[in-house]
């Protein structure tokens, strides 16, 4: 039985997060899991999409959620649900539970296919963002399995963080922060890194090829 080298912990000022329970080496796989819920909504379409364009996708997401067993629904609803004055403004037909689900999905989803499908994961969706990450993630399209791998050494007790927008290019730090704040509904407090450690890791590990060799 493999014991994960990470655990969910309370993080001051962030709520929950993932912390190393032992020292982690660069390139080490720390987590692999399947999603609780998959939808065709991304953070951007959830908040800024036209009502007619996103209404069907929202209904499908709610239906998929309703088809989960109660234990899975409870895990989904336990994820962070940010308060937002514009939450679900394009979907007044939704009840409070559905609006909460939409906020959870917008804030916690992880991309599976490039701008096609996103998933909520029991553990990985609690990993916090950093513009200077020490890990990266990648979901495999064929089975939606997600792998999280370190891109530098991580000390015991240190938080494992990823860059939610590692593949996006932003001309300025302000544009990057605006996108994060608008889509993920939290204030990014990190500065633009001078060296993208995870981009280096992707090159070293053959464009995530090692994710599927464990």
Tell me what each language-model feature is.
Residues 3-5, 15-16, 117-118, 124, ...:
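Generic secondary-structure boundary/loop-capping signal
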Residues 5, 41, 69, 179-186:
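Glycine-centered secondary-structure boundary/capping sites
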Residues 9-13, 23, 91, 115, ...:
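Compositionally biased, low-complexity repeat tracts
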Residues 14, 18, 24, 114-117, ...:
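Intrinsic disorder
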Residues 32, 36-137:
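Catalytic cores of histone-lysine modification enzymes
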